[in-house]
From Swiss-Prot:
Induction: Expressed in the late phase of the viral replicative cycle.
SUPFAM superfamilies per UniProt: P-loop containing nucleoside triphosphate hydrolases
Protein name as it appears in the record: Uncharacterized protein B354L
InterPro entries (alphabetical): P-loop_NTPase
Family, similarity comment: Belongs to the asfivirus B354L family.
Highest rank taxon of the organism: Viruses
Lineage: Viruses, Varidnaviria, Bamfordvirae, Nucleocytoviricota, Pokkesviricetes
Length: 354
């Protein structure tokens, strides 16, 4: 339901959809206890059917246990740090953590692109028995015709994706048919990884202190500017809008403000370079939006050209994020033992010397 200001301006309500967040960066701004984590969990629920992998970095998790029951403990980190390469007095652990994620996602992206090659999928399709092809040829022809007639690049990309999904669906439904066929290495590779979902959800919850040294690093900029190429959906929770530099703030696809003062501060800040019209609009609507549990949402590239919305989301009920295979692996490697950071200089005061 839209809200109306005293001057008659409308503030539509936003119903979150997966396309708002998939392969994009979302930033939530607001002090503690203003509902940031409630929104994160709501977004997680929306993304659950589309993303099978998740990593959470939440320094406050040991005390507030915000993600308990939603994310398996093995996928929650209390700091940005790559444990398997820890060195004494090493300040690059956070950078290596992000580099490891990026390298893995780059590989996942490469495999996904190879598997979804249209020519390879068509080759595999034509290796199916004739009766199966005859049954599916009508649907294939419709999509091929739409693809050939399309001149709009974005629509053509959507039709190409539809074509890929249709071919994959037919191949997967009949995958047992390939068992006794003579196949090339590329064909075997495609069949082996045809169900691969490369997408990852990365949540950085109140990590401002650890993120600050990374703002000038190329690896962190990649996560902001190139994450869609590696199928990374990123959510960052900040206490204040100044927790991120202006160049990164402006590049977030979705910005969610849980507090009126931080919202006003963000849009009035000179370094963010919002138009005078936007500043005046935010000043007028802030008094109306931030009542009860309502928040303000700003979408940078809005297909409706509205950009500003109000939103209220329900309290989340527990669910386990991740694929069945991921959760099975997590349970297999999980240890309830509390891990002590032995690189902490105070460890020497407590360790036992036998």
């Amino acid at each position: 339901m839209a809200l109306t200001t005293h001057s008659g301006k409308l503030i539509p309500e936003l119903q979150f959809k997966a396309h708002h967040f998939i392969d994009k960066t979302t930033v939530l701004y607001g002090p503690s206890k203003t509902g940031k984590t409630v929104y994160v969990k709501h977004i997680m629920k929306i993304l659950q059917p589309h993303i099978e992998q998740i990593l959470v970095v939440a320094p406050s998790e040991p005390s507030n246990r915000s993600y308990e029951g939603f994310v398996h403990p093995t996928l929650i980190h209390y700091r940005l740090w790559l444990a398997d390469k820890q060195k004494k007095n090493d300040n690059k652990g956070a950078e290596r953590f992000l580099e490891a994620i990026w390298q893995r996602q780059t590989m996942m992206s490469s495999i996904y692109s190879r598997v979804n090659n249209i020519d390879m999928l068509k080759t595999l399709y034509h290796k199916l028995p004739i009766d199966i092809q005859q049954k599916e040829n009508k649907n294939i022809a419709k999509v091929e015709c739409l693809k050939a007639e399309q001149t709009d690049q974005k629509k053509e990309e959507k039709i190409t994706s539809l074509y890929q999904q249709l071919l994959k669906k037919i191949i997967i439904q009949n995958i047992h048919m390939y068992k006794n066929l003579c196949l090339t290495e590329n064909e075997k590779f495609t069949l082996n990884y045809i169900n691969l979902n490369p997408r990852l959800l990365l949540i950085l919850d109140d990590c401002a202190a650890e993120l600050h040294p990374l703002f000038t690093k190329e690896i962190f900029k990649k996560f902001f500017y190139q994450n869609r190429h590696c199928f990374i959906s990123m959510i960052i929770c900040c206490q204040d809008d100044t927790d991120l530099p202006a160049n990164l703030r402006k590049n977030a696809f979705v910005s969610i403000f849980t507090n009126a003062s931080i919202c006003m501060s963000n849009f009035s800040r000179q370094s963010n370079r919002y138009s005078k019209q936007d500043k005046e609009y935010v000043e007028e609507i802030s008094h109306i939006v931030f009542k009860g549990y309502r928040k303000l949402v700003y979408i940078r590239e809005d297909e409706n050209r509205q950009h500003f919305y109000h939103s209220t989301v329900p309290l989340p009920t527990a669910f386990s994020f991740g694929s069945k295979a991921l959760l099975k692996l997590c349970k297999a490697v999980y240890s309830k033992e509390v891990v002590i950071d032995k690189s902490n200089p105070y460890w020497s005061k407590f360790r036992l010397n036998f």
